[in-house]
């Protein structure tokens, strides 16, 4: 705990990764945040949980593409609830899931993470999975906040290459991809969102005001925050070459959410 105290007191730490932690360990860290930081803001413990919580001894369910092959969206709700219960038992409050990417290119190496290529089927599973995770009361000990990803157009990259620009134009993104997220946010009431690395019509999603604010918040009613997918913000500087500095990349993202 002394090492942790030194780390938190003398560094600008934005997040701490504690994979495989127990609820007891999470409580120790949480108590430190509340009692020893200037504002006393509790930490939000989040984790990957695509088809099961990413930790030892958690239940591993079929990948989403396998679940979608059942054509039974209610199974998504059952899986979501089971994942939520196991996550909360480990001290996790939020999951980086479910994946809402619509896959139209079989070369894409992460196709198994999605619910497939059909907008309607993906939307049905999206809503049910979120409802299973969040339930009707997030204060109960068997629910977590859902963070659907990757918003948006991430599953259709040029050449099937991960993170590459989306091959779909805005018309196809709005008509095919966004209804899946609408089901998760407007119907399922998902709390937060994770934005994607890709660009659509040369505009990086991580700084797309129309998608992040007008659509996600204005139309879909997303109440929480937008999390950048790992380096999605810094890539405005060293990948998309739009920002002149890393600081400018941060500014461009913040002013558009």
Q: Language model features by range: what are they?
A:
Residues 1-255:
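Glycoside hydrolase catalytic-domain context in secreted enzymes
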């Amino acid at each position: 705990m002394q090492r942790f105290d030194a780390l938190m007191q003398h560094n600008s730490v934005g997040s701490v990764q504690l994979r495989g932690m127990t609820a007891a360990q999470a409580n120790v860290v949480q108590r430190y945040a509340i009692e020893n930081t200037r504002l006393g803001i509790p930490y939000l413990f989040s984790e990957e949980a695509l088809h099961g919580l990413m930790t030892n001894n958690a239940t591993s369910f079929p990948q989403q593409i396998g679940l979608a092959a059942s054509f039974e969206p209610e199974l998504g709700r059952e899986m979501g609830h089971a994942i939520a219960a196991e996550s909360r038992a480990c001290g996790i409050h939020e999951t980086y899931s479910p994946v809402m990417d619509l896959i139209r290119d079989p070369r894409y190496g992460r196709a198994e993470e999605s619910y497939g290529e059909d907008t309607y089927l993906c939307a049905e599973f999206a809503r049910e999975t979120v409802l299973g995770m969040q339930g009707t009361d997030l204060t109960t000990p068997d629910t977590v906040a859902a963070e659907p990803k990757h918003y948006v157009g991430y599953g259709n990259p040029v050449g099937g290459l991960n993170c590459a620009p989306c091959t779909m134009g805005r018309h196809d993104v709005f008509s095919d991809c966004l209804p899946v997220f609408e089901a998760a946010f407007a119907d399922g009431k998902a709390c937060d969102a994770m934005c994607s690395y890709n660009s659509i019509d040369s505009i990086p999603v991580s700084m797309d005001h129309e998608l992040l604010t007008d659509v996600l918040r204005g139309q879909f009613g997303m109440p929480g925050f937008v999390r950048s997918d790992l380096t999605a913000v810094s890539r405005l500087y060293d990948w998309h070459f739009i920002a002149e500095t890393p600081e400018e990349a941060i500014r461009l993202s913040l002013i558009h959410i």
